[in-house]
Amino acid sequence: MIKLGTYDTGCKPANPKEYFAKIHEGGMTPKKQFRGESKGEWLDFSSSPGNQVATIQNFLKERGFFPFGKIDGLCGYRTSSSMRLFQEYVRSVERDASIGAPDGMFGRQSLSHMKRWHKKAIEADWNQFTSADAQPEFKKWMVLLSKIRSHYRTQPTALLRKISAFGDATDSLGVNNWDFDPQRIHLIGIRRNEAKPGKRENDDVFVLLINGVVFKFYGTTDPGKSTNSSGAPFLVHGQHRYRFGWHKQFDDQKVYRALKPRSSGVLIIRDSNRDFALTPDDLAGRLENNASINIHWGGRGVSNWSQGCQVICGRGYINHNNDMIDCSSFAATTYSTLGKKVDNVFQTKGAYSVLVDLVTAFSGSEYALDYMLIYEGDLKIDPGFGANMAVKINAVMNKE
């Protein structure tokens, strides 16, 4: 079994402390171990005779799952993500259930599928696309982003003017600095029903533009709860720089990989009357820079876990072929079932893991993406795009 922490003969890092210092964060309990999937699970290095890890890495690289990976004979976080991405591809694109739930561990079944691909010279169908030669839908989203930028450069809202004038360090960009380079990875959050008071639902949509293809997820961009006496934080409209990091890094039982503000934090405004609605009065409030607004997992999607973070639910997603992919059988509802079997199916973070694995595989050495938060009304800026696009996507995501 090849899994996180497995290394080929002679490929264990000479200085494990230095190795983990580069990939873990300062708030985490210092450990010379890999963070596993289940609650409180930490994995030691484990040796495997021969060069099986390197063989798997070479295969994944050739077939489109490990394009920026290093062939080093060590199954680290990037290799494990690429292995899980291959498993999900076989399950969801080839529709071959024999591989089982994607768990990032290569045993007999995964290795047999790897041999099948090698024998038949199969590769991921997304290899036919690049940022320069992209899917038509990818191009449509990029055109929409460009039109949104042009619109707000000439007609900035009061909030966008405040963001541009913000004088301190922040990872939130003023409208004149919004950058939609198609070679970069872009995640678009579409905020819906933000002015509606009361219980916040998982009714928002996320669109991942990556290497010329499009994936769609659902969750929430709005806080559903908050313990802050000043009111819940709402991430502001516009583009923000994010990087890979760790969510809940001070809790070694629950810490897991997530996207965090690139350096100093992102700009928020407070829900001053604490009604969990984003109103004109709130928008007129003071900007704050906040380093804790992460993009993270939200369970299967039963309730809103956000306290201001951007939250991706695990129940399902729409893949690059525009197929709705159901992950509910292996999408954990809570931390307590992560990494365990429920009805004999290994539980992961489901669709959220797909997003993480895609960004891990295709982010290069930067391990980062650009996050653009727009309003549903912004879809109307491009009349040919479809103002009800987010409604349609959300309806598909929440279909029982």
Where are these regions (language model features)?
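Cell wall/extracellular polymer interaction/catalysis modules
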Residues: 122-299, 317-320, 325-399
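Short beta-strand-centered segments at strand-helix junctions
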Residues: 306-320
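Glycine-centered small-residue hotspots that permit tight backbone geometry or close packing
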Residues: 5, 38, 46-47, 237-240, ...
